[in-house]
C-alpha cells in the first residue's frame, strides 16, 4: 500500500530501537520483547559493534534478535526511512548505548544510521531514551550526557530495579526495558511501585 493511500488513515505508532556495542545486549533484546507485546511497530538498527557484542555475550543469533522487530535497517543505510524527520515515530531508544554513540549524538555527528536516527529524533522533538552502559563515567561522558539532556534526551542508566522481585539477570534487565517503554509513553504491562 502506498504512502499516498495511507495519508490521513490511522497508522500504527512506530518506535526506533538501536543496539550498539556497549556491554548489555540483553537490554536491547528485552526492550524488543516488551515492545512486541504492544501495538507499536518496531524499527531496529544494530551497529557493527552491537553485532560483535551480541555474539560475545549471548547465545542469540543475529536472526533471532532481528526477528523480534517489525523492520530491520542496515547500520550503513543512510537513506533508510528512520533517517528522515518526515518518517513519524513516537521516539527512539538506544539500548545499550555505548559512550561512542552517546558522544556522536551529543556532538551532532551522524556517521551511522544509529546516530542519524537519534539526531532526527532530537531535531523533531521526539523522545530519545539512551540506556547508557558504562562504569565508571568520565567527565567527558558526564558532559555529553548533560548536553543531551539539555537537548531533550533522557539518559536512562542501565541500573535494574531490584525491588520488582526479579529472579534472574534477564528479568532484572527487563526492569530497565520496562522503564524505557514507559518513558516513550507506550502503554504496556510492567511493574509499578505500589500496584
Question: Predicted segments — roles?
Answer:
Residues 1-195:
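A cross-family phosphate/adenosyl-ligand binding-site feature
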Amino acid at each position: 500500500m502506498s504512502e499516498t493511500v495511507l495519508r490521513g488513515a490511522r497508522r500504527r505508532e512506530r518506535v526506533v530501537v538501536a543496539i550498539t556495542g556497549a556491554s548489555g545486549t540483553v537490554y536491547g533484546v528485552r526492550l524488543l520483547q516488551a515492545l512486541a507485546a504492544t501495538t507499536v511497530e518496531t524499527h531496529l538498527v544494530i551497529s557493527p559493534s552491537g553485532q560483535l557484542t551480541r555474539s560475545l555475550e549471548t547465545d542469540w543469533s543475529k536472526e533471532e534478535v532481528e526477528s523480534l522487530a517489525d523492520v530491520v535497517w542496515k547500520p550503513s543505510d543512510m537513506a533508510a526511512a528512520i533517517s528522515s524527520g518526515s518518517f513519524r515515530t513516537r521516539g527512539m531508544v538506544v539500548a545499550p548505548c555505548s559512550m561512542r554513540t552517546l558522544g556522536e549524538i551529543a556532538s551532532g555527528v551522524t556517521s551511522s544510521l544509529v546516530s542519524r536516527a537519534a539526531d532526527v529524533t532530537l531535531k523533531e522533538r521526539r523522545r530519545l531514551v539512551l540506556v547508557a552502559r558504562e562504569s565508571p563515567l568520565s567527565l567527558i561522558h558526564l558532559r555529553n550526557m548533560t548536553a543531551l539532556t539539555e537537548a531533550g534526551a533522557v539518559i536512562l542508566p542501565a541500573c535494574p530495579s531490584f525491588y520488582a522481585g526479579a529472579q534472574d539477570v534477564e528479568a532484572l534487565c527487563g526492569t530497565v526495558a520496562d522503564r524505557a517503554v514507559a518513558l516513550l509513553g507506550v502503554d504496556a504491562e510492567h511493574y509499578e511501585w505500589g500496584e
